[in-house]
Amino acid sequence: MVNKRATIHVTGIVQGVGFRPFVYRIAKSLSLSGYVLNLGDAGVEITVEGEETQIQELIHTIRNNSPSISRIDTLDLEWSDPQDEFEEFQIQKSSTIRNEDAIPVLPPDIAICKDCVNDLIRKRSRWYLYPFTSCAACGPRFSTITDLPYDRPNTTMLDFPLCDTCNTGYTNPLDRRYHAQTTACHDCGPAYRLVDNKGTMIASTNIIERTAQLIDEGAIVAIQGISGTHIATKTSSHEPIETLRLRKKRSHRPFAIMIRDLSTLKQLTHINELEEKILTSWRRPIVLVSKNSGNLKNAVLPVIPAESLESIAPGLDSIGVMLPYAPIHHLLFRNTNEPALVLTSANPTGMPMYIEPEIIMNELRDIVDYFLVHNRRIHQRADDSVVKLIDKTNPVFIRRARGYVPEPLLFNGPWETLKVIGVGPEEKATGSISKSGRIYMTQHIGDTNQIENIEFLSDAINHMLHLLDINKPDAISCDLHPEFLSTDFAERIAAEYEIPLYRIQHHHAHLATIMVDGLIPYDSRIICITADGFGYGSDNNAWGGEILVGDYSDSIRRGGLKVQEYTGGDLSAIYAARSLIGILGNRMDKKRLLHLLGSSRIAPDTEVSEKILDVLLHAKRQNVNKLLEDLAYIMYMCT
């Protein structure tokens, strides 16, 4: 028997995922002594003494059987002679020392686990019907964290001191809720209230059951959740969905739906093995699936009526679906007969989602009938992530947010020691910060042509800088376009910190992103076809659809689509008839073109006419996306 001492340093997603209790239980079962320590922003340290074979077994178990929601990026091991200083194995108090060169991996929000779902529906459970139940393996993380290390005082659960019973489990290393920072119960935790759109509190012995009844009756309800707020209504009838569209002034954009369970989803549509794996993962994103493949094959009444499906995703062959990921979702489906609920973000189109109860109720009273809101602060809002499979095997992000943020991407190259902020483009923006060879992306922000979204971007970036312990970044980058609000925002940050500002050509940014995503070595050059829309070119002209040759640092434009003359500037991006006129105006007889366009609009209340066709101004813009839209528009007009 050979006794040894081992010091193990583990980095990755090892905080807020039950990693320390896991190590504690294994070490105790192997009769090892020592400790496991949360290093705050630098991973977890494990120091153990005991038989060498038992220590090897501990390391093997950590590598191969750690909690499913954890992720080990590095495991460094140092052997030494035992010092016989430990009587037992303990979980030590987290370190509060911040290391400027540390590589923190911050935990995303995690869907409710099966054990907590059982607690939710088991009558003898202390958490029976409690809509905020969680444990060390599940529940909100990123949306509640205010600082590191990830301990309860550094979350919004600071507002809810634990009762004696909850504290007993919280301090017991063998309990599933040991150091579960968001744990609580009916007696000590957050609570919901139900209010109508006139501000009247709805009294009920079970307000969640009452909310489900209201939805069954066709009501539209705002429901505050883990990291944001949804507007919900039923799917068994298309009328409430059409009412929601009318009130939200969202005539065509699709809604997402939350399906009761996996078996119900499989009655609605066919999903492959990978789609099922993603849908049921602890990340629980929205997945775009075929809208009709299930119903077309069913000889029985479809799970969701065809009229409702068309109202949910008008004119589309796919639909965004997700499964319940929070306790409140399971409780709502427990009390409703609906197979699915429409869930759309609680915000006006193009604006950040509302997360404060009073703002939710003030701003949405003309859209919703009732509000189900709670008193736990959401420190960082995050929309539902959206994933789509390409070729049935390759999942790609349409939107990266809840469940994935703030996990970093690896980034190798001579710049990996630099701390750089990226503020993103104008459309579908996401901020990012590089540190220690990682790129930490913020949650999805949206279009930054609104000042409210710039404020959201600023808040998200500042929060990430704080968590990463970056007091002064080395540089900041923005889009080359001089008139974007995000460009102005970057200029202000550069001036505030007195750091360089780098203006990046939009399509070169796409090229560099492909290299990062593919882990292509930094000294490589690639040929990249950017089948993208408008980008401000290095020659101060509009670019779109380039063939670029380049690397991380720069690129050369070797070719691209022929410049097309689009009418009315940015209105061509809204009214396809304008761009079609720009392309075909000099190539087609006027009468034939007018016949093709029919009653198409070129402005909110203006249809195409011969006179208008004669006077439309032409503004040059090269844009591959508009060209594809024009082709689609012609195909639509000809059918």
Model feature map: region roles:
Residues N65, G169, T336-P414:
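Internal gly/pro-rich beta-alpha loop/helix module
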Residues T487, V549, M588-T639:
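Hard-cation-handling environments
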